[in-house]
Curated annotation (Swiss-Prot):
<dbReference type="GO" id="GO:0022625">
    <property type="term" value="C:cytosolic large ribosomal subunit"/>
</dbReference>
<dbReference type="Pfam" id="PF01632">
    <property type="entry name" value="Ribosomal_L35p"/>
</dbReference>
<dbReference type="GO" id="GO:0006412">
    <property type="term" value="P:translation"/>
</dbReference>
<keyword id="KW-0689">Ribosomal protein</keyword>
<dbReference type="InterPro" id="IPR021137">
    <property type="entry name" value="Ribosomal_bL35-like"/>
</dbReference>
<dbReference type="GO" id="GO:0003735">
    <property type="term" value="F:structural constituent of ribosome"/>
</dbReference>
<dbReference type="InterPro" id="IPR001706">
    <property type="entry name" value="Ribosomal_bL35"/>
</dbReference>
<comment type="similarity">
    <text>Belongs to the bacterial ribosomal protein bL35 family.</text>
</comment>
<protein>
    <recommendedName>
        <fullName>Large ribosomal subunit protein bL35</fullName>
    </recommendedName>
</protein>
<dbReference type="InterPro" id="IPR018265">
    <property type="entry name" value="Ribosomal_bL35_CS"/>
</dbReference>
<keyword id="KW-0687">Ribonucleoprotein</keyword>
<dbReference type="InterPro" id="IPR037229">
    <property type="entry name" value="Ribosomal_bL35_sf"/>
</dbReference>
Amino acid sequence: MPKLKTNRGAVKRFKVTGSGKIKRAASNHNHMLTKKSQKRKRRLRKIHEVAPSDMRAVSEMLRD
């Protein structure tokens, strides 16, 4: 059986921490920002953790 490939799009969007958690950037922070409040945009700047329910799917895409 051949080696399974890593999803290259996922590699660019997620980063695995030393403890095994997966970090991701918030969505909704690229365009049409004038209608969003400063408070909302400030919250979207932060790096978030992948939810436990999504961990398996993201881990399989990263394959490392």
